[in-house]
Design a protein with these regions (language model features):
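Compositionally biased, intrinsically disordered low-complexity segments enriched
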Residues: 22-25, 37, 110, 132, ...
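Extracellular glycan-recognition regions
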Residues: 27-218
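Sequence signature of WD/YWTD-type beta-propeller architectures
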Residues: 214-511
Length: 511
């Protein structure tokens, strides 16, 4: 068969375009499955993943994302169902285009006029939830009062989308839209648009997370989501996932030599080697059914654990065991539930929350201490409701704890003999588990939203913040935005140098 020269050229061009498109679509970048330019862009974009730093750089051109046509660069993965997208992002350099933009986007397809929802941050600070409900229709938007946030979250719940933003350190502000009806799989990812067909812009992204939340049929403590063990620099907020497993991993403690993390899972304890990134079973003899309240002594020689009593009748009692492992020694009396949270700096005392017969309320737990070698327990608090999370300061002058006595769960402290109980926080959130840095300068806690969680509860699988404040007093600052809760940071998790913390975040890993 004979072809004309012009026909051969046309076929070659078509073939080349198909190859470029295929390569663009199939290029895996970090957690994303592919990337492509959407629309008729003049300058090809790109997305690069730095695995060492767990960061993304996305370059994009394109005239706009507006009216009935979009032009931008998109790094994406296909998903279905509900999800939570979260990132911290910023543009590289300055630009003459006030409306260059980046953010999260969910699209029905990769064509230029697809139905879509975008959590959009513009170069001049304009922040908006933009959406096109049907293909070939104009984009609509819901603007925020916040200008230029760097933390961006987009959540899908059925046909509802919720955009939440914050300047790092602050709590989220949200907007939402409903009646967004996508069919089947959608394209989910990060985008950059130059807002100028002749220009190219670049944005950097860190702490990129795609979370699949718990379904409505999940029964707490019967079924669990997967877990990420993460570490974070508390000053910069930079996070890194060290280990992931489709199981409930909880409450990592940093060992005093800085070499391992100790966590619990499925009733046992594990040591996670920070060099090899491999866990190994920590031997606890006949003691099983260990929960997430375990604490390493200040000198690093002993471990306190909370586990079912030897007779199996009490769900949690306190034991001690050498950090080399062995047969634990029962410390607390068999009078009711006891959950360990702290050692005294000299190693002579353990402090814990316990339920005894003198408080008939369901959540009636008070703070106690007991000699670490065993002996008579001493009650330190005695109020209705829940006192929890007692932890000694490194100088031994205070025991920090959280209490619901003022209405919401707030942070408190007292002298080691129970005197001079004073409230440290008083905000519109539920703040749990005050963890004091080894240098005594900082307090980190986990914060639950009062609209999602009762003050005396700290359940799995919720939107939570990790927040930090000076130990000398001051406002709480958000240092992490995550999906977690129970098991995230129940017990001390500071690195020995007071620069980092370890914690657990959650997502469904069943598929």
């Amino acid at each position: 068969m004979r072809f004309k020269t012009s026909s051969i050229i046309k076929l070659s061009i078509i073939s080349s375009c198909m190859m470029l498109s295929a390569n663009s679509f199939s290029q895996k970048t970090g957690i994303f499955e592919g990337q492509t330019d959407v629309g008729k862009v003049l300058h090809s974009g790109d997305a690069i993943y730095n695995s060492a730093n767990d960061e993304y750089s996305v370059t994009g051109s394109g005239a706009n994302i507006w009216f009935t046509n979009d032009e931008f660069h998109f790094v994406w993965k296909k998903m279905k169902g509900d999800f939570i997208l979260r990132v911290r992002g910023k543009f590289q350099g300055k630009s003459v285009e006030a409306h260059r933009k980046f953010g999260w986007m969910v699209r029905q397809g990769l064509d230029t006029s697809s139905a879509m929802v975008a959590a959009t941050i513009h170069g001049d600070g304009l922040t908006s939830l933009q959406y096109r409900k049907a293909a070939h229709t104009n984009v609509e938007e819901n603007k925020f009062d916040v200008s230029g946030p760097d933390v961006v979250q987009l959540e899908r719940k059925g046909n509802q989308f919720i955009m939440s933003v914050a300047h790092f350190g602050e709590t989220f502000v949200s907007r939402q839209i409903s009646d967004i009806n996508f069919d089947g799989d959608v394209y989910v990812g990060l985008f950059v648009c130059a807002h100028n067909k002749n220009a190219v812009e670049k944005a950097d992204f860190e702490n990129v997370r795609i979370v699949i939340p718990a379904g409505k049929d999940l029964v707490p403590y019967k079924k669990y989501l997967g877990s990420h063990i993460e570490t974070m620099d508390v000053i910069t907020g930079k996070r890194k996932i060290l280990y992931s497993e489709n199981a409930s991993l909880q409450a990592p403690n940093w060992t005093k030599d800085g070499k391992n993390l100790l966590y619990n899972s499925n009733g046992s304890l594990f040591l996670f080697d920070l060099k090899t990134h491999k866990p190994k079973l920590f031997p606890t003899g006949r003691v099983k059914d260990i929960n997430n309240d375990h604490v390493i002594s200040f000198d690093g020689k002993m471990l306190g654990i909370s586990a079912r009593s030897p007779d199996g009748k009490i769900g949690s009692t306190v034991f001690t065991v050498p950090m080399t492992g062995g047969e634990p020694k029962l410390i607390t009396p068999l009078l009711g539930f006891s959950y360990l949270h702290g050692w005294s700096p000299d190693g002579k005392w353990l402090t814990y929350t316990a339920k005894r017969n003198n408080d008939p309320t369901p959540a009636g737990f008070d703070i106690y201490k007991i000699p670490s070698k065993g002996g008579k327990e001493i009650q330190l608090t005695n109020v209705k409701g829940l006192d929890d999370g007692p932890e000694y300061s490194p100088d031994g002058k205070y025991i920090y704890f959280n209490s619901v006595r003022s209405g919401l769960m707030q942070l408190w402290r007292m002298k080691p003999d129970g005197s001079d109980q004073e409230q440290l926080t008083n905000d519109d959130y539920n703040n749990w588990f005050a963890h004091i840095s080894p240098d005594g300068k900082w307090i980190v806690c986990i914060t639950f939203l009062k609209d999602e969680v009762k003050p005396d509860d700290h359940p799995f699988y919720k939107h939570v913040y990790l927040r930090m404040m000076p130990a000398s007093g001051g406002p709480l600052k958000v240092i992490a935005y995550l999906y977690g809760g129970q098991g995230t940071i129940n017990t001390p998790s500071w690195s020995p140098d007071s620069k980092k913390i370890a914690f657990v975040s959650n997502t469904d890993m069943s598929e």
